[in-house]
Curated annotation (Swiss-Prot):
Transmembrane segments: none
Organism from which the protein derives: Methanocaldococcus jannaschii (strain ATCC 43067 / DSM 2661 / JAL-1 / JCM 10045 / NBRC 100440) (Methanococcus jannaschii)
Protein name (record): Probable dihydroorotate dehydrogenase B (NAD(+)), electron transfer subunit
Pathway recorded for this protein: Pyrimidine metabolism; UMP biosynthesis via de novo pathway; orotate from (S)-dihydroorotate (NAD(+) route): step 1/1
A GO molecular-function annotation: metal ion binding
HAMAP family registered for this protein in UniProt: DHODB_Fe_S_bind
Alphabetical list of InterPro entries matching this protein: Cyt_c3_hydrogenase_gsu (IPR012165), Dihydroorotate_DH_ele_sf (IPR037117), Dihydroorotate_DH_Fe-S-bd (IPR019480), Dihydroorotate_DHASE_ETsu (IPR023455), FAD-bd_FR_type (IPR017927), FNR_nucleotide-bd (IPR039261), OxRdtase_FAD/NAD-bd (IPR001433), PyrK_electron_transfer (IPR050353)
Pfam families: DHODB_Fe-S_bind, NAD_binding_1
Task of the protein: Responsible for channeling the electrons from the oxidation of dihydroorotate from the FMN redox center in the PyrD type B subunit to the ultimate electron acceptor NAD(+).
Domain FAD-binding FR-type span(s) in chain numbering: 2-89
Length: 257
């Protein structure tokens, strides 16, 4: 197993009340959708997707991310990676559907696809206006449709509701998505209705990040999210029984959505 690259935090951006972006002093050659293992000395190591070549956006959801949010500019972290599969463009028109912190890997894909001349529509969702991420970046490289659960900005409702509206008006060659797994399961179902290929970024509890420990294996195929994913094609998801239903915690216990 490779050693982490020691990086210094040169900037911390408060993206929302619960999300911070940590910009480090080294660039990484990653592909959109890939992740790295971030190491906090004396704490632990956890997986996070890239939000740019030298940054990671972290939502405060548990003890590790709480420690991350306590870091200051100038502090040290370790970065091991990049690892995993990534979003691959096909065709000339792509629909991107992002929810919550899932906007982080999606923005990297949208920016990369845009450089290749692909026309992109992004549906970006969050619970409230304050929790919407990367609005300026999405607007620069895609046609942006915004959804909030409470109606504080844009369309009031779920991204999947807006997705149905968009698909009634336009045709797309590919759909990519990242966000809450229940949302992504619905995205896949809608994509299948329209016979559009779809790529999904899954999240699972990980330890090694390279497919050795088996901590992130999913039922029934035994696929490792860290190595066979995190980005899966929709046709492979039919064989992952737990997708959209449950995940496992560190002890292996099922946590139902």
């Amino acid at each position: 197993m490779e050693k982490p690259v020691i990086c210094r935090i040169k900037e911390i951006i408060e993206e929302s009340p619960t999300v911070k972006t940590f910009v480090v002093d080294k660039d990484f050659d990653f592909k959109p959708g890939q992740f790295a293992m971030l190491w906090l000395p004396g704490v632990d190591e956890k997986p996070f997707g890239f939000s740019s070549k030298n940054s990671f956006s972290v939502a405060r959801v548990g003890e590790f991310t709480k420690k991350m949010h306590e870091l200051k500019e100038g502090d040290i972290i370790g970065v091991r990676g990049p690892y995993g599969t990534y979003f691959e463009p096909i065709g000339d028109k792509v629909l991107a559907v992002a929810g919550g912190i899932g906007a982080a890997p999606i923005i990297t894909a949208v920016e990369e696809f845009s450089k290749q001349g692909i026309e992109i529509t992004t549906i970006l969702g969050a619970r409230t206006k304050e929790e919407l991420l990367f609005l300026d970046r999405f607007e620069k490289v895609s046609r942006l449709e915004i959804c909030t659960d409470d109606g504080s900005f844009g369309f009031k409702g779920f991204t999947t509701e807006k997705m149905k509206e968009v698909l009634k008006e336009e045709k797309f060659d590919l759909i990519i998505t990242c966000g809450p797994e229940i949302m992504m399961k619905k995205v896949v179902e809608i994509a299948n209705e329209y016979n559009i290929p779809v790529q999904v970024s899954m999240e699972r509890y990980m330890k090694c990040g390279i497919g050795i420990c088996g901590q992130c294996c999913v039922d029934d195929e035994g696929l490792c999210v860290c190595k066979d994913g995190p980005v899966f094609w929709g046709d492979k998801l039919k064989f992952i029984r737990e997708f959209g239903k449950y995940k496992r915690d560190a002890s292996g216990k099922k946590i139902y959505y």
